[in-house]
């Protein structure tokens, strides 16, 4: 199984992430790791290079970018280095359990060909998810932890290169389902994801970029009324910006204009 992990100033998470993958390897021996670094300025690359047990993995690649080209682009690059039938994408601020990949492999083996991707369960704060309690089928998956059939990932040309960060997973999920494949949520395939310090926490960068890219997706997949609602949401956020989003007005305005002119004739 190919595992792609994107890093950017991620020195805080490297050892914990790698140590957990090493433990999981005991039950799923053929793990190939592809780290794509988006031009970190800290010790991320040095820590990856110096990891003393990297030879215990079937493959351990570090791909360094000369500039940060975004989360989706970096994942696409990492996936291009592998060849396995299943590609797994993990955020660097995650830890897998010893049986994570073993359970994933069992579920994949039991899945029909119409299942194109499998989303992991995130702990301690579960990713908001609506899914069929019997089949596990869901409408979209989080890019923080999921696996996909390589042939499908390649067919869809991976993540959209125009989406720098946030909502690239929603876009990919939509295109996957539009190609007549399904996404299965797997509650028994668990990871720890340290994205938030507390439940309900707001990350300004995530909120702002999600807002901008939400509008992009409304242009791409929605109706005229969907787009108008998106602009209305933009206006509300822009004029009522306060609290953790204070200081983001210029970014929001830039995203508004950029999305309008880029996708006006999409």
Describe these PLM feature segments.
Residues 10-24:
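Short, well-formed alpha-helical segments that are part of the catalytic scaffolds
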Residues 20, 37-46, 67, 94-97:
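A conserved acidic beta->alpha catalytic loop
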Residues 30-39, 63-65:
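Short beta-strand/loop segment that forms part of the nucleotide-sugar
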Residues 64-82:
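Glycine-rich, basic loop-to-helix element that forms the pyrophosphate-binding segment
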Residues 87:
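Short aromatic/hydrophobic "clamp" motif used to bind/position activated sugar donors
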Residues 95-132:
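Conserved donor NDP-sugar-binding/catalytic core segment of glycosyltransferases
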Residues 104, 146-148, 152-157, 162-190, ...:
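A short, conserved alpha-helix in the catalytic core of glycosyltransferases
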Residues 183-265:
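Active-site-adjacent helix/loop segment of glycosyltransferases
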């Amino acid at each position: 199984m190919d595992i792609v992990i994107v890093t950017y100033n991620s020195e805080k998470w490297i050892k914990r992430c790698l140590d957990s993958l090493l433990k999981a390897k005991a039950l799923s021996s053929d793990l190939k790791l592809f780290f794509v670094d988006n031009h970190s300025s800290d010790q991320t690359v040095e820590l990856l290079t110096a990891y003393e047990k990297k030879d215990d993995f079937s493959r351990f690649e570090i791909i360094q970018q000369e500039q940060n080209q975004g989360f989706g682009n970096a994942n696409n690059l990492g996936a291009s280095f592998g060849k396995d039938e299943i590609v797994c994408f993990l955020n660097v601020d995650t830890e897998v359990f010893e049986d994570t990949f073993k359970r994933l492999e069992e579920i994949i083996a039991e899945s029909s060909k119409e299942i194109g991707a499998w989303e992991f369960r995130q702990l301690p704060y579960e990713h908001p998810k609506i899914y069929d309690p019997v089949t596990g089928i869901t409408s979209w998956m989080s890019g923080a932890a999921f696996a996909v059939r390589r042939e499908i990932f390649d067919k869809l040309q991976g993540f959209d290169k125009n989406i720098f960060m946030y909502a690239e997973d929603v876009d990919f999920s939509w295109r996957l389902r539009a190609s007549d494949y399904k996404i299965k949520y797997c509650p028994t395939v668990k990871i720890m994801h340290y994205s938030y310090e507390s439940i309900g926490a707001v990350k300004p960068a995530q909120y702002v970029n999600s807002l901008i890219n939400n509008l992009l997706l409304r242009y791409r997949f929605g109706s005229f009324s969907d787009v108008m609602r998106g602009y209305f949401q933009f206006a509300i956020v822009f004029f009522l910006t306060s609290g953790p989003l204070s200081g983001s007005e210029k970014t929001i305005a830039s995203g508004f204009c950029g999305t309008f002119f880029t996708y006006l004739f999409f």
